[in-house]
UniProtKB/Swiss-Prot annotation:
GO biological process: protein folding; regulation of hydrolase activity
Domain Jacalin-type lectin, first and last residues per copy: 2-142, 152-295
Protein name: PYK10-binding protein 1
CDD domains: Jacalin
Species, as recorded: Arabidopsis thaliana (Mouse-ear cress)
Listed GO MF terms: carbohydrate binding; copper ion binding; enzyme regulator activity
N-acetylalanine: residues bearing it: 2
Length: 298
């Protein structure tokens, strides 16, 4: 249950409320005019999907300030400072995240107020507005979620039993994929995971070549990996097989193939689930790959 902190500022104009069911605030846009803050507009993420609230106030001809972007899930909005005039108009606002502080947009004159709750983050706003922004309040939620993740399920890996076993484990989600290639197949893989609120870069599995890594970046958190398909094949001078091609499918797109399609085709997928981790076997090449999955409700 979110905690509502009452709006500060004037009492007039039209009441508005963005709601208290968002996961986080991701972007703030606003503009200051002669009389004070002319408008404000908030972007949120809710159940992994971006959501933009209506503009509060009036746009007019004033130039907007640079947007204050919050890099969710690693960054969250901690507090808001503001100032309002005797006429009940917000004169200036400053936003503070766990990583940075905005400049004061507008003026720091008038009655000062702060919207902040210890050990909580802002997930929504409410207030009042007419020709200007008259008041501003916020909804706060605990920094750590109280809803535990559903236990992950490990899917069987494909490939050969050459090399050494590796396992990154299961996380909240996958943010980036790195794939290295060699003459005989995939030389190495590396993944960047969301371990809210931190980002974790997994170890390199295999051995990268002078060609380095190719990168596949997801539009996280609204984009997630639903399946991985690929091929594995025996190579000259080895009894085992090597992963020769990998391709990553998300809820929004399919990556280009990394490597050359040759040998036995496989697919790693569980209906209604997303991939949240990887495991397999490797030495100087990638010999085997499997995944950890969680239900999409997570």
């Amino acid at each position: 249950m979110a905690q509502k902190v009452e709006a500060q500022g004037g009492k007039g104009a039209n009441l508005w409320d963005d709601g208290s069911t968002h996961d986080a605030v991701t972007k703030i846009q606003l503009a200051a005019g002669i009389d004070g803050i002319q408008y404000v507009q908030f972007d949120y993420v809710k159940n992994g999907q971006p959501e933009q609230a209506p503009l509060r106030g009036t746009k007019g001809r004033v130039l907007p300030a640079d947007p204050f972007v919050i890099n969710h899930p690693d960054e969250h909005l901690v507090s808001v400072e503001g100032w309002y005039s005797p006429e009940g108009i917000i004169q200036g606002i400053k936003f503070i995240s766990n990583k940075k502080t905005s400049d004061v947009i507008g003026s720091d004159e008038g009655t000062h107020f702060t919207l902040q709750v210890k050990d909580k983050k802002i997930i929504g706003f409410h207030g009042s507005a007419g020709g200007n922004l008259n008041s501003l309040g916020a909804y706060f939620a605990p920094l750590t979620t109280t809803t535990p993740l559903t236990p992950a399920k490990q899917l069987t890996a494909f490939g050969s039993d050459d090399g050494t076993v590796w396992d990154d484990g299961a996380y909240v989600g996958v943010k980036k994929v790195y794939v290295g290639q060699a003459q005989d197949g995939i030389s190495a893989v590396k993944f960047v995971y969301d371990k809210s609120p931190e980002e974790v870069t997994g170890e390199e599995h295999g051995k990268s070549t002078l060609l380095g890594f190719e990168e596949f970046v997801l539009d996280y958190p609204s984009e997630y990996i639903t399946a991985v398909d690929g091929t594995y094949d025996k190579i000259f001078g080895s009894d085992g097989s090597v992963i020769t091609m990998l391709r990553f499918k998300t809820n929004k797109q399919t990556s280009p193939p990394f490597g050359l399609e040759a040998g036995t085709v496989f697919e790693l997928k569980e209906e209604g689930h997303k991939i949240v981790g990887f495991h397999g076997r490797a030495d100087v090449l990638l010999h085997k790959i499997g995944v950890h999955v969680r239900p999409l409700s997570n």
